[in-house]
Amino acid sequence: MKSVILLSLAACAVAAPTAGVETIHDGAAPILSSSNAEAIPNAYIIKFKKHVDHKSAADHQMWIQKVHGEREDERLELRKRGLFDSVNDAFTGLKHTYNVGSGFLGYAGHFDEETIEKVRRHPDVEAIERDTIVHTMRYEEVKKDECNPDLEKGAPWGLSRVSHRESLSFSTYNKYLYSAEGGEGVDAYVIDTGTNIDHVDFEGRAHWGKTIPANDQDIDGNGHGTHCSGTVAGKKYGVAKKAQVYAVKVLKSNGSGTMSDVIAGVDFAAKSHKAQVSAAKDGKRKGFKGSVANMSLGGGKTTLLDAAVNAAVDAGIHFAVAAGNDNADACNYSPAAAAKAVTVGASALDDSRAYFSNWGKCTDIFAPGLNIQSTWIGSKTAINTISGTSMASPHIAGLLAYYLSLQPASDSEYSLATITPEKLKADLIKVGTVGILTDIPKDTPNVLAWNGGGCSNYFEIVSKGGYKAKAQADKSSSLLDSVTELEKAIEHDFRVISGKVVKEASSMTGQAEKLSEKIHQAVDEELKHFFGEARV
């Protein structure tokens, strides 16, 4: 029986093909095998040589079908005689034909050894490879943004507030949750009294843009602009800690100026932004995401200032402006009434509207504005605590810069973030905390700014939408309790710090007791002032 099988296979091997001009040659094509894949028995992929055209390929495939058919007829006869296992000796022949562009002509099939030997020795065949099992690539589940924020301890309460949904408590009042990349690639124009650009909190990211008033110096002689700049982009005091700050001085040291100078400052910012856009598109500035501007100033209603601000927004600048400090309708003030800017009202530590803050339908959003600590003038380390919608607005300018920097990278590393000021303004309001504030007049949006809790996935933040504050039966009482709780927490922190100072002092001098008394007196005075303001 064995000799019959061998003779039959031998006879098949020397049988000449009958299809067309197919011939056999001595140089056989290699059979390739993968060393790290599971091969399928008797399954092969065949690639033709480059000279083979479509007609020759079709002729070859007809030939291999004929060879395979003849082999199957012979095996069928042997099966009838019980000489082959009908299950283990099944060959299906031609499976696929390939014509991949102009670089790959071939076919695949399931052939016995004798047939594949004929294929190997065919002059049109370049290579043969054993077919193998393939699998999907190993993958990891796509995880949603787990929101692993950076944490700034000992942060100003305003920063803490914009990074938490609920009212501040013992565990959150001085903790700012943020994304470390916040502000990167963004220019912030602070149109104000100037900026102390040498302050250490700016880490060299503050620059002098332009002094608009004639015959004035390139310094901040007031402090207001420096304070705003620190809230926008300071390392400790800023919302967007990697933004570049540009001082645009439009007000003199006494804090006043002319509307024409203010409009000139807006014009400067718009032109500077346009120049940076061109630089980015020309490949001269890498990683530029866009520009924001803050204007914590204002006066009576003026159509042209509002028009200038709106035009700057149309030019691509994301603009934040203060609502005003007269406890009146913001629509009666400029640039608070500029429709395309983000007009910002001020909130207090207890989540009430700050007693001085303007309100009304022209107010878009609220941000912390009472007792805000930030950078100041007089030295490279000076700080000051002041209040106003002037302090609320830079929280929003910083937040606009922060959100701009979180925009996903575009195809070109030099391209701008594609989000428009109109869209970002809408998103900013959309994700805000709704209904948390008290003493909000009718027709005034009850929305407090939020930075996404430190998450860096912008679309994840926006897709979740806004957050409606939990209802409270007696919110005024609850908020008073919150302030009392915070008072105890902050006082505790002051006491701990002063205790450490006294401990150090006792090892150096016998005046520790007197020093301790002075420290506690200072703490008591500071707390009395701070919470007196917070309870107004």
UniProtKB/Swiss-Prot annotation:
Keyword annotations: Glycoprotein, Hydrolase, Protease, Serine protease, Signal, Vacuole, Zymogen
Keyword hit for Phosphoprotein: no
Propeptide: 16-147
GO CC annotations on file: vacuole
Active site: D192 (charge relay system), H224 (charge relay system), S390 (charge relay system)
All copies of domain Inhibitor I9, residue ranges: 44-137
Pfam families named among the record's database cross-references: Inhibitor_I9, Peptidase_S8
GO MF term list: serine-type endopeptidase activity
Annotated InterPro entries: PCSK9_ProteinaseK-like, Peptidase_S8/S53_dom, Peptidase_S8/S53_dom_sf, Peptidase_S8_His-AS, Peptidase_S8_Ser-AS, Peptidase_S8_subtilisin-like, Peptidase_S8_subtilisin-rel, S8pro/Inhibitor_I9
Protein name: Subtilisin-like proteinase Spm1
Species name: Pyricularia oryzae (strain 70-15 / ATCC MYA-4617 / FGSC 8958) (Rice blast fungus)
